């Protein structure tokens, strides 16, 4: 809040000499001083219209001595002002304006922050940011409910952070919900600090309750930050840099993992991969095209979410087939108590001998149960016929 509170000490705004020559023009410079009462402010206060004068109200005495004195601030808003370069290109500068009430009874006007005395700004801003930086849900709710003021739940500090960012970082589910109920944006990125959304901040600080609340309130789980990272990628980066097995970081890792799990629920539907059929990308962007065991459509899935053994087999060039049953076994050539199994395939006519590690554990268990039944003289179900 330092940047918000360091404004020129200006509590009175003086109009220009009304006898000075007036040249109609359109100005976009800020800051400007209020022309009161012989100028009219536009609602957005982005362009200053100097071509529409108003008749000054009589205050008695010389008009040069007519002042508009601020009574108090009753609302705020964040605006974007255009800035034009010499080459004609345009950018925007974000600024804060305040709706001020005047002691002389003039109707409230929107004034740039830098044109208002620091003590007046502080009187309005300090209660809000004190509550926001503590994630004080009760005080935030009370301030938003104050009908004498119109609080903007998306008010920004100098870094473009809102109260929602602080509530997310401190893990206050109650404060997150109170702000959202008042209309706060649950997905607004901060202007500084990497363009993080509240969801990035909540997961990065290991706040699972805040992550869950933000997702329930509509936060986009795959929105990128300023570096192009999704919230899940950010927490994976943080976890990778947080030491394992260190008592000093044990609780932090637990919190980060809990927050990551909340995100995973929103991003992924868990399913069993039948096989990997293709791959693309490199490094952190590596993805695999997988077939699901339940018959769902093929999908591209990030490498981190595919079982390591499947990835290794695909990268090694191994092919997959669907086994129907194990029909026989024999001791492997290398001996040492190792076995090979004769596997009947669904999509391959000829059965093949495979090492145990290449055969589904459930099929092996079924085969052994059949063999046990035969050895005991029971009626074990026969294996499927083998072509040959």
UniProtKB/Swiss-Prot annotation:
The keyword Nucleotidyltransferase does not apply. Residues 1-42 form a transit peptide. One of its GO terms (cellular component) is signal recognition particle, endoplasmic reticulum targeting. One of its GO terms (molecular function) is identical protein binding. Its main location: plastid. It is found in: Plastid, Chloroplast. The keyword Ribonucleoprotein applies. Residues 68-137, 271-332, 321-379 form the Chromo domain. GO terms for biological process: protein heterotrimerization; response to high light intensity. ANK repeats lie at residues 123-158, 159-188, 194-223. It holds the Pfam family Ank_2. PROSITE patterns: ANK_REP_REGION (PS50297), ANK_REPEAT (PS50088), CHROMO_2 (PS50013). Keywords: ANK repeat, Chloroplast, Plastid, Repeat, Ribonucleoprotein, Signal recognition particle, Transit peptide. Residues 1-24, 46-66 are annotated as: Disordered. InterPro entries: Ankyrin_rpt, Ankyrin_rpt-contain_sf, Chromo-like_dom_sf, Chromo/chromo_shadow_dom, Chromo_domain, CPSRP43_chromodomain_3. PANTHER family: ANKYRIN REPEAT DOMAIN-CONTAINING PROTEIN 39-RELATED. Component of the chloroplast signal recognition particle pathway. Targets proteins into the thylakoid membrane. Homodimer. This is Probable signal recognition particle 43 kDa protein, chloroplastic. It comes from Oryza sativa subsp. japonica.
């Amino acid at each position: 809040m330092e940047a918000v509170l360091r404004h020129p000490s200006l509590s009175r705004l003086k109009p220009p000499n009304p006898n000075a020559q007036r040249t109609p023009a359109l100005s976009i410079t800020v800051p400007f001083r209020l022309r009161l009462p012989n100028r009219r402010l536009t609602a957005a206060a982005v362009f200053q219209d100097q071509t529409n004068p108003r008749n000054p109200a009589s205050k008695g005495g010389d008009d040069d001595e007519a002042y508009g004195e601020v009574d108090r601030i009753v609302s705020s808003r964040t605006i974007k002002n255009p800035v034009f370069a010499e080459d004609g290109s345009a950018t925007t500068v974000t600024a804060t304006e305040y709706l001020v009430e005047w002691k002389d009874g003039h109707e409230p006007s929107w004034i740039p922050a830098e044109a208002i005395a620091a003590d007046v700004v502080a009187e309005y801003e300090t209660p809000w940011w004190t509550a926001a930086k503590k994630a004080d849900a009760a005080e935030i709710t009370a301030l938003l409910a104050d009908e004498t003021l119109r609080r903007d739940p998306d008010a920004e500090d100098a870094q473009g952070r809102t109260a929602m960012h602080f509530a997310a970082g401190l893990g206050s589910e109650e404060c997150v919900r109170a702000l959202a109920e008042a209309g706060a944006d649950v997905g607004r990125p901060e202007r500084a600090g990497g363009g993080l959304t509240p969801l990035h901040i909540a997961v990065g600080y290991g706040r699972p309750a805040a992550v869950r609340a933000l997702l329930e309130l509509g936060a986009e789980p795959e929105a990128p930050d300023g570096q192009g990272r999704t919230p899940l990628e950010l927490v994976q980066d943080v976890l990778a840099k947080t030491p394992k097995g260190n008592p000093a970081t044990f609780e932090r890792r637990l919190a980060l993992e809990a927050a990551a799990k909340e995100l995973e629920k929103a991003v992924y539907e868990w399913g069993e991969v039948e096989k990997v059929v293709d791959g693309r990308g490199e490094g952190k962007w590596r993805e695999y095209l997988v077939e699901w065991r339940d018959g769902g459509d093929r999908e591209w899935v990030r490498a981190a979410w595919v079982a390591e053994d499947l990835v290794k087999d695909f990268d090694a060039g191994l092919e997959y087939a669907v086994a129907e049953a194990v029909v026989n076994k024999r001791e492997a050539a290398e001996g040492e108590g190792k076995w090979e199994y004769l596997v009947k395939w669904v999509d391959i006519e000829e059965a093949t001998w495979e090492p145990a590690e290449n055969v589904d554990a459930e099929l092996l268990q079924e085969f052994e149960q059949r063999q046990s039944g035969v050895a005991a003289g029971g009626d074990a179900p026969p294996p499927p016929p083998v072509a040959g």
